[in-house]
Design a protein with these regions (language model features):
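Zinc-dependent metallohydrolase catalytic domains
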Residues: 3-4, 8-25, 29, 279-289, ...
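Short, compositionally biased low-complexity segments
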Residues: 87-105, 112-119, 170, 174-190, ...
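Contiguous, non-catalytic segments that form substrate-binding/exosite surfaces or channel walls
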Residues: 110-303
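General structural feature for long, well-ordered alpha-helical segments within catalytic domains
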Residues: 121-124, 137-140, 308, 312, ...
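Structured segments of extracytoplasmic/periplasmic soluble domains
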Residues: 1-4, 124, 128-131, 144-147, ...
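Short active-site segment of divalent metal-dependent hydrolases/proteases
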Residues: 313, 317-321
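N-terminal helix-rich structural modules
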Residues: 1-130, 136-140
Length: 421
């Protein structure tokens, strides 16, 4: 997954990695280390500024999903010349856009573009499937191996939802953050985790409230989903391994997958909470930052439980709200219509709707009201943690949007004399 993702970020990454590996100087070792952290020569925590001499000044918004320098207008003009099925392939999660021998644009499925990596990956998954005695995990590994070869991920995505095993595996093309042009194309990643059965059972109760929250979202009722997908699985796990898009730059604390709207409609989504990662983020990042930005009186209200619960609610809220929509008589999705603005808007939606949902549950005595003060205080402190990701990253941009709006509305105050909020 690392090898594929590296090539998805930028077509020059593989060659640059080899060049850095050949540099045995101390600064060369440091550059290679940071290159691998960022999956490229741009610092994701520093507005994508380049740190390797000779690398492009600007990280390409196209990644390597599209021809270098391609604009959104060029893509839109091209797909207007295609048939419906060809247009669907061009916008697919699982294809790249390339120039053929005659310099004409074409879509190439992932199983062809990344064949040299996916064929051996499929072999490894089949070998792993043969070793496990857990039938649900075995089924997923076998079907995901087949998907790597066929480029049809639907069946294995559905099966992934039903994994019930001590070891939970997520592997394949999922998130679309790296496609800065349209957020159409999925990046490859992998997570191997150990399930925390007790914590998973404790949080499963939140699933029973999702339809009620959906029915009470502050939006025009016509945009509400009258019947959410049947699956609303919540898994609390400890991460033991991550790669590809799951192990670059800022480490994710949780994920809500799959993103394929067909699967979401039928089965819902699975929310995976990486508890050991969240504990590290809270203790090693949020607490130290809070001592700088929050008043001493408010620091007592910070709580890991509030931090963990808001992240859980955030992931649950990704599955709520409009997904499949009709625009000018066309059946489409929110993701396809919002294009490059989708990811930050979706992350902001999940953050704020998470607060709305938890407030709703507290107001209706479904969640302990004592969470209220710690929830909002911890949310504010966490905003300073997340905005460090930068405006070029979806979560960082989403937090900046929220922070500025809430500041304008007087949701919190800044004391210029103390420098605290």
């Amino acid at each position: 997954m690392d090898a594929i993702f590296l090539r998805q970020v930028w077509s020059g990454n593989a060659a640059m990695e080899k060049k850095l590996e050949a540099d045995k100087t101390p600064i060369g070792r440091e550059r290679l280390h940071y290159f691998r952290i960022n999956a490229g020569p741009w610092s994701r925590l520093d507005e994508d500024k380049p740190f390797v001499p000779g690398s492009p000044e600007v990280k390409p918004v196209t990644g390597s999903f599209y021809p270098p320098g391609m604009t959104s207008d060029e893509f839109e003009n091209w797909i207007q010349t295609l048939s419906d099925s060809e247009r669907e392939n061009a916008k697919s999660y699982f294809s790249v856009i390339r120039l053929d021998a005659d310099k004409k644009l074409k879509s190439v499925p992932y199983n062809e573009e990344y064949k040299q990596f996916l064929d051996p990956a499929a072999k490894c998954l089949r070998e792993a499937a043969a070793l496990t005695t857990n039938e649900s995990l075995k089924s997923f590994l076998e079907k995901r191996a087949a998907a790597f070869l066929s480029n049809d991920y639907y069946d294995s995505d559905v099966t992934w939802m039903d994994i019930d095993a001590p070891i939970d595996v997520t592997i394949g093309p999922y998130e679309t953050y790296e496609d800065g042009l349209f957020n159409y194309k999925a990046s490859f990643e992998a997570f191997v985790t150990l399930k925390d059965e007790a914590e998973s059972a404790k949080l499963a109760r939140f699933s029973q409230y999702l339809q009620e929250i959906e029915d009470n979202l502050p939006e025009d009722p016509k945009y509400r989903t009258p019947k959410l997908g049947s699956g609303a699985a919540i898994r609390v796990v400890d991460e033991v391994f991550a790669s590809g898009d799951g192990n670059r730059g800022v480490q994710t604390a949780a994920y809500n997958l799959p993103n394929d709207e067909r699967v979401v409609k039928e089965k819902g989504t699975k929310r995976v909470m990486l508890k050991n990662v969240q504990e590290a983020k809270f203790n090693k990042t949020l607490i130290p930052i809070s001592k700088v930005v929050l008043s001493p009186a408010d620091q007592k209200d910070l709580s890991f439980d509030a931090f963990f619960t808001h992240i859980l609610s955030h992931e649950l809220m990704h599955g709520l709200g409009p997904q499949n929509i009709v625009v000018d008589g066309r059946n489409t999705t929110v993701r396809l219509e919002l294009k490059e603005t989708y990811s930050p808007i979706e992350e902001a939606k999940a953050d704020i709707t998470a607060l709305f949902a938890l407030q709703y549950l507290m107001d209706h005595n479904m969640v302990d009201k004592r969470l209220e003060r710690t929830l909002y205080t911890t949310y504010l402190a966490s905003a300073f943690r997340s905005v460090r990701f930068g405006l070029s990253e979806a979560h960082g941009k989403a937090v900046a949007l929220q922070f500025n709006y809430l500041s304008d509305k007087g949701a919190f105050n800044y004391d210029a004399a103390t420098g605290h909020y």
